[in-house]
């Protein structure tokens, strides 16, 4: 990790103190985060916090805890926890946040939230007058959910039935077109049933459909919606992009990897986070360079991505060294990150281990087996959307795929031997 460490969010056991000359205010190069041999399979960062899900599904958190956003009971500490600390005994599939409200999904599909509740964004039926914050994860819904996200004061999620929901602050119609300004419980957004993923910006959201189209709604502050309109929208998602392989939403900018692996972006660009060499906002989707990309992440005012060849690049705001380039200068162009192997490196992804998926042409169920102990299995469709997930603790498991549409799917496993990918066809 790299960047600002004023609340201990780098997880290196330190935090910034202006009274200490040898402080740890920031890190201008990427450094590893370690926790007693724990293997992490995913990580997410908010402004002041970091969260990681281990290979066994356990959730770890560190950083500021002023509103209980670490989920660790105690509150009121700006620089709260300096190293990864286990939150609870639950098994987590998804955890996301942007500021001081966190939402997550257990492996059983139930939806949870904790942290700040200024506009009812926890979704537990209470506003800030009755519940200012939740210091431990609270259940939002017993139903099964696929994905979730939180903005500054609103939250949004996708149910297992493909419906889209939102709640919290509605001052910019980031929930729906109602005149109500606050919703303390989830409200359905439209009637479509083909939503698969969702992410939230400060006052807007972007959701992906099964056909690979990306839709946005809420405030168009700083051109975040990807279309030339001013102010807030009518609360109805509108299509912003087609043929999406993956995408990421920052503060008010959006990055998309298209199905041809090209990178596109739009929105806020004051700090060069769209890498077009300028500081002007971009109203509509615009291609960024000509390289091909495998993954990208939009931060608050900066961006990081990995190209097809495995090289890591960063650009945008760099006041705290978050670009990992060894300095604190902003970049308005793509800038390659050089890793020092002694300080941490990108983990190798294994693609040739003895992981097998059978039958290779399936109708009801597939079986995944390996010589190593598998910790998790994810299923992705041809557009790169995750359509299935299961925690595992063994060398073999079965997954029901009867609900999937016909087509080609990829099975990604995490095991003691590393990461592997196999393919099967749903008949």
Predicted feature residues:
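Hydrophobic loop/turn residues within beta-sheet-rich immunoglobulin-like superfamily modules
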Residues: 53, 105, 158, 192, ...
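Conserved core positions of repeat-based scaffolds
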Residues: 1, 49-52, 61, 101-104, ...
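Short glycine/serine- and acidic-residue-enriched loop/turn motifs that recur at repeat junctions
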Residues: 3-27, 63-83, 115-134, 167-187, ...
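Blade-level signature of beta-propeller repeat domains, shared across WD40, Kelch, NHL, RCC1
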Residues: 297-343
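C-terminal outer-membrane/trafficking sorting elements
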Residues: 350-358, 362-427
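Short coil/turn segments that connect the beta-strands within blades of beta-propeller domains
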Residues: 48, 57, 100, 109, ...
